[in-house]
């Protein structure tokens, strides 16, 4: 990571007030970047005129598009909002990039769930088939197709448009409903057993800063030279763990009798297994995950127990792990 690259760099972040967006904005601010954020409730990526005007006024050199409806269960409840936000919102971000000459690199954040998951245990690589059984996963696959179409049709040289696909990101500050870590924390704080669905499913758990580190490396490289159009950022294979493992680890770190139990209610389908191959990012960007699953859980639980005071401390501790 080139810290000097980010000093005084003009960066436009959609979804800057969300879970990953808050961490990214804080990190870039610490690096000296001039960050402009665009988020709900006042700023909606489904409003093209508003987004284009905001981006034009900011004159960013780098855009990182994070804004999304990011929950699988919510996508079953409101598929229309999921598709309009994740697909049309992405198209609007790309249209705004087209209309903003200052942009040199556009990082479009999708998801590891953009791949057609047939239940096989093999990790997904960037060239695997896209697809999605649930509305959320399908919307991210559709967003990937839109990104590729804009890259080939309208933005073949500059700005360079890259899609980035991370695993299941955990860390402090995620308060989403129907997401594992926030649900655990809410139950632990209330002194109640957390209700967990599908405890035997396997996911590529990774700390939020590991994923964001990949995004900023992709932006740095895309700013300077041509790179492939998509990158996976997933943890080491050994850190693809079950939901049961993560719930047990969070409860143990939390202490105080924290516990969970498997929900007996019926739930919408979720893939049994998910993992990523990140060879391309390792070879071309020099990216590698710095925190193993155990450390990621410890940092996450500690943040929720000590709240926001740990955000800057954990960013600084993570940066100390980076090569000089």
Regions found by a protein language model. Give the residues of each.
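Catalytic helix-loop patch of NAD(P)-dependent Rossmann-fold dehydrogenases
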Residues: 77-95, 99, 104-105, 114-169, ...
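Rossmann-fold scaffold of SDR-type NAD(P)-dependent oxidoreductases
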Residues: 14, 60-66, 108, 232
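N-terminal Rossmann NAD(P)H-binding glycine-rich loop of SDR-like oxidoreductase domains
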Residues: 11-27
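Conserved glycine-rich Rossmann-like NAD(P)H-binding loop of the short-chain dehydrogenase/reductase
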Residues: 33-40
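A short, basic/flexible loop-to-alpha-helix module at the beginning of a structural domain
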Residues: 1-9
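NAD(P)H-binding glycine-rich loop region in Rossmannoid oxidoreductase-like domains
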Residues: 45-85
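C-terminal substrate-binding subdomain of Rossmann-fold SDR/epimerase-dehydratase oxidoreductases
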Residues: 31, 188-324
């Amino acid at each position: 990571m080139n810290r000097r690259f980010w000093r005084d760099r003009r960066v436009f972040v959609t979804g800057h007030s969300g879970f990953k967006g808050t961490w990214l904005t804080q990190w870039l601010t610490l690096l000296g970047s001039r960050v402009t954020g665009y988020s709900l409730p006042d700023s909606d990526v489904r409003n093209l005129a508003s987004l284009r005007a905001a981006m034009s006024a900011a004159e960013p050199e780098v855009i990182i598009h994070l804004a999304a409806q990011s929950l699988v269960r919510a996508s079953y409840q409101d598929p229309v909002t999921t598709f309009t936000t994740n697909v049309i919102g992405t198209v609007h971000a790309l249209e705004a990039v087209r209309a903003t000459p200052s942009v040199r690199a556009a990082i479009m954040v999708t998801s590891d769930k953009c791949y057609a998951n047939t239940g096989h245990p093999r990790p997904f690589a960037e060239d695997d088939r896209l697809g999605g059984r649930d509305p959320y996963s399908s919307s991210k696959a559709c967003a990937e197709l839109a990104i590729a179409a804009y890259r080939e049709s309208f933005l073949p040289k500059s700005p360079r448009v890259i899609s980035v696909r991370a695993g299941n990101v955990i860390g402090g500050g995620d308060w989403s409903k129907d997401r594992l870590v926030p649900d655990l924390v809410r139950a632990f704080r209330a002194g109640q057993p957390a209700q967990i669905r599908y405890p035997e499913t396997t996911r590529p758990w990774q700390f939020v800063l590991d994923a964001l580190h990949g995004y900023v490396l992709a932006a740095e490289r895309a700013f300077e030279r041509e790179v492939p159009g998509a990158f996976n950022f997933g943890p080491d294979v050994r850190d693809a763990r079950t939901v049961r493992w993560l719930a047990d680890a969070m409860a143990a770190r939390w202490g105080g009798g924290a516990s969970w139990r498997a929900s007996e209610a019926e739930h919408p389908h979720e893939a049994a297994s998910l993992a990523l191959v990140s060879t391309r990012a390792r070879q071309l960007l020099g990216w590698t995950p710095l925190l193993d699953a155990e450390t990621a859980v410890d940092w996450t639980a500690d943040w929720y127990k000590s709240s926001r005071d740990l955000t800057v401390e954990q960013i600084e501790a993570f940066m100390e792990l980076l090569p000089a």
